[in-house]
Curated annotation (Swiss-Prot):
It is found in: Cytoplasm. Belongs to the lyase 1 family. Argininosuccinate lyase subfamily. One of its GO terms (cellular component) is cytosol. Keywords: Amino-acid biosynthesis, Arginine biosynthesis, Cytoplasm, Lyase. It comes from Ruminiclostridium cellulolyticum (strain ATCC 35319 / DSM 5812 / JCM 6584 / H10). It catalyses: 2-(N(omega)-L-arginino)succinate = fumarate + L-arginine. This is Argininosuccinate lyase. One of its GO terms (biological process) is arginine biosynthetic process via ornithine. The gene is argH. It comes from the Bacteria.
Length: 459
């Protein structure tokens, strides 16, 4: 008989049991469910709602159940529906009627809200640690490539010269924001919903703050309806993870391009590449491709959560059972991607000479020649037009701007002097951009110093 079966004249059909059950995926929350129940039982005893002996027996029995689960001695039952009812059923089978007192002042509605918050906050901590590893990897790579000149791109067309350090530190900033978003998400998640009951709280004199303190929550929810029906924290986490995966996907795309023979900017380590079953010469960037592909999977989890919640009236509805597989899969996917991605980035070989050669083509110093004319007193728009014509001339004559003679330069503007050759060198183009946020070495060194300071401050 179901623990809630008193109102029913007959049991549920087996098809309903299978359809209704969530134990196959919510069993991963067993530890959090039991720890929440231990804290609840402790509070019930301290508040005199059950006796101290009963509270002690329940707590010790729950600890034994936890140990038995972790030792693989317990098989969960589908007809017990979920992790909450499975644990309670086992408890009652071991200590009888005393076990039936555990659920006093509690509903599965606030119980599951507690469990999933506890589970996800642990996962946030784990993911933050993985992001921190990636951030460290990016800093190390940047520090090793402060003078590695490469083309910066817009529209995937060569635009202006930068350094690989500057490029990778751009990703540092992205993943730093991801880390900070996870911290913010944690703070909103870390609120105790237990005590909200089914939807309207309880008449028992519970001490919610005692439970919150024991379980490490910062506060308790202030509205019982919201406490049991809120899944914003899961949606927010899925959103944070989607943005994180978007950043992984962008860097993946660049690694895929850079490792191609068409670019040949980097070579992936053999340990993070794969081959072809038919083409012996192939060395494929499968890690980057899978990270790019799995991004859509995490997006799908976010859309699932939003769709599940979009039309639900207050308070709890069974639809909300669908939240778990979506957020669990998003978490699992991100945790699978981050470590292997960090190792791939950390072990890839940079082909500095190819990057430099690419920066020499595509007229990446054209903006600097325009700026050179501006410094000589020519309005920027006029300078822009002059250099545009100069680029066209070079294209038609198959030469780089650097290869033009002084006579050729003078044909476009008599303001151009011999110092132009120094001013438009790739090294000068990069070193001249000293503003905060620019690619000049001294600016990038400061950015790396700030990055290290941020990383050292992480808890």
């Amino acid at each position: 008989m179901k623990l809630w079966g008193g109102r029913f004249a007959k049991g549920t059909d087996k098809l309903v049991d299978d359809f209704n059950s969530s134990i196959r995926f919510d069993s991963r929350m067993y530890r959090h469910d039991i720890l929440g129940s231990i804290a609840h039982a402790n509070m019930l005893g301290k508040c005199g709602i059950i006796s101290a002996d009963e509270s002690s027996l329940i707590q010790s029995s729950l600890k034994n159940i936890l140990n038995d689960i972790e030792a693989g001695k317990i098989d969960f039952e589908i007809d017990a529906e979920d992790i909450h009812m499975n644990v309670e059923k086992i408890l009652i089978s071991r200590i009888g009627d005393t076990g039936k007192k555990l659920h006093t002042g509690r509903s599965r509605n606030d119980q599951v809200a507690l469990d999933i918050r506890m589970y996800l906050r642990d996962e946030i901590i784990s993911i933050k640690e993985m992001v921190a590893v990636l951030l460290n990897t990016l800093v190390k790579m940047s520090e090793s490539n402060l003078d590695t000149i490469m083309p910066g791109y817009t529209h995937l067309q060569r635009a202006q010269p930068i350094t690989l350090a500057h490029h990778m530190m751009a990703y540092f900033e992205m993943f730093k924001r991801d880390y900070q978003r996870l911290c913010d998400c944690y703070s909103r998640m870390n609120i105790l919903p237990l005590g909200s009951g089914a939807l309207a709280g309880t008449t028992y004199p519970l001490d919610r703050y005692m439970v919150a303190q024991e379980l490490g929550f910062d506060d308790v929810t202030s509205n019982s309806l919201d406490g049991v029906s809120d899944r914003d924290f899961a949606i927010e986490l899925a959103s944070c993870l989607s943005i994180l995966m978007m950043h992984l996907s962008r860097l993946s795309e660049e690694v895929i391009l850079w490792s191609s023979h068409e670019f040949s900017f980097v070579e992936l380590d053999d340990a993070y590449s794969t081959g072809s079953s038919i083409m012996p010469q192939k060395k494929n960037p499968d890690v980057a491709e899978l990270a790019r592909g799995k991004t859509g999977r995490v997006y799908g989890s976010l859309m699932t959560l939003l769709t599940v919640m979009k039309s639900l009236p207050l308070a709890y509805n069974k639809d909300m059972q669908e939240d778990k597989e979506a957020i669990f899969d998003a978490v699992d996917t991100v945790k699978m991607c981050l470590p292997v991605f960090s190792n791939m980035i950390g072990t890839m070989k940079v082909r500095k000479e190819n990057m430099y050669k690419a920066a020499q083509g595509g007229f990446t110093n054209a903006t600097d020649i325009a700026d050179y004319l501006v410094k000589k007193g020519i309005p920027f728009r006029t300078a822009h037009e002059i250099i545009g014509k100069m680029v066209l001339y070079c294209i038609e004559n198959s030469k780089a701007i650097d290869d033009m003679t002084m006579e050729e330069f003078k044909s476009f503007s008599d303001k151009i002097q011999e110092d132009v050759y120094t001013e438009i060198s790739l090294e000068k183009c990069v070193s001249g951009r000293k503003l905060v946020g620019g690619p000049a070495r001294e600016t990038e060194e400061k950015a790396i110093e700030n990055a290290k300071s941020f990383l050292s401050s992480l808890d």
